[in-house]
Amino acid sequence: MRLLALHVHDFRNLPQVQLTPSAHATIAVGQNGQGKTNLLEALYFLATLKPLRAGRLSELVRWGSQGARVTGRFLLKGAEREIAVEVGGGTRQAFVDGKKASSLEDYFGGVSVVAFTPDDLEVVKGGPDSRRGFLDRAVFNRFPAFLRESREYARALKNRNRLLREGHTVDAVYLEAYDETLAKAGARIYSRRRALMAELAPRAQATFASIGRTVDPAVYNYRPAHLEGDFAAADETALAAMLRESLSARLRRDMERGFTSVGPHSDDVSVTLGGRSARAYASQGQQRALVLGWKIAEIENLEAAMGFLPLLLLDDVSSELDPERNAYLMGYLAQSGAQVVLTTTDGSLVRGAAADDTLWLDVHGGQVAVRADAEPPPAN
């Protein structure tokens, strides 16, 4: 897979951007607040239909404009394909080769990206919600249908919570119907997460062993809370039954609190180092190495599953890594042959990922300019 062309119109602070990215590294350099992260987010939004940062869709539209549009032309398995997404009025529309996409699966059609941001480096010491989001982005990259499936679960959860807030006046028959819907949708989420972890965790653990600077082994694990039974061996039907049982057992508590306390939305990813919680006991450098190991494993896992490398998006990550681990990452990017778009405030930090065909960009005040020379711009 290769991104051949990118056109961005009125996305965040970017009025117009037209690029022919390098087949290898495209590096955007600029000070904070100038728009380099917005360029990366435009690409991420194009490939996933989800913003890279939390917020409303309306925030993606440049101030004073009616709508935003991002268009990308890709080479996929020898054939060119154009996808586009428009945002306006708080909604988004997706297009494939100039026509409205018939489904999410039709839209994605093999386009895959892996994003790596400074916020990701804080995942290990963050809260469960950040680790769930981190896991679910990886699940979506591996199984694009997960976007639709997670939305189905979110709708079912919202409906059940609405009924729970009615307290003891709620009709048990209605609640049972919502429990059934939620259990089936939740079982699918469990199954997707479990499948991804089975593929990715061993790779991440092996990568960490080479960069962690410790003999302590890393273990990444996902095991839902409040489920009784053999999670590892259960099929989706059994998982749904396990979730239904947990929903029933916690019904009184849920009615008192007005929300659903069990399900995929309340789970966590366990990361341990030498058998101890990495969140509590690992150093900051080790925590970041654990995340770096995960991201490299995600890239390698997607290549193994799809037969090609995803597009890589790195947002000023180098400034947050120590020199040794940054050198490891830059060397990996250069050797992998992947197409990568990086942002940085200092071009010297990412020189290790550059090649003769690297496209260097200067970003200032929402304007993106291609540098005529091949040398990285000096640090300011």
Curated annotation (Swiss-Prot):
Gene name in the database record: recF
This protein's record includes keyword Isomerase: no
Entry-linked Gene3D superfamilies: P-loop containing nucleotide triphosphate hydrolases (3.40.50.300), RecF/RecN/SMC, N-terminal domain (1.20.1050.90)
Family: Belongs to the RecF family.
Protein residues bound to ATP: G30, Q31, N32, G33, Q34, G35, K36, T37
InterPro entries: DNA-binding_RecF, DNA-binding_RecF_CS, P-loop_NTPase, RecF/RecN/SMC_N, RecF_2
MF terms in GO: ATP binding; single-stranded DNA binding
Name listed for the protein in its UniProt record: DNA replication and repair protein RecF
Keyword tags: ATP-binding, Cytoplasm, DNA damage, DNA repair, DNA replication, DNA-binding, Nucleotide-binding, SOS response
Function: The RecF protein is involved in DNA metabolism; it is required for DNA replication and normal SOS inducibility. RecF binds preferentially to single-stranded, linear DNA. It also seems to bind ATP.
Subcellular location field: Cytoplasm
Coiled-coil regions listed in the entry: none
Subcellular location, principal: cytoplasm
GO cellular component, one term: cytoplasm
One matching Pfam family: SMC_N
Gene Ontology biological process terms from the UniProt entry: DNA replication; DNA synthesis involved in DNA repair; double-strand break repair; SOS response
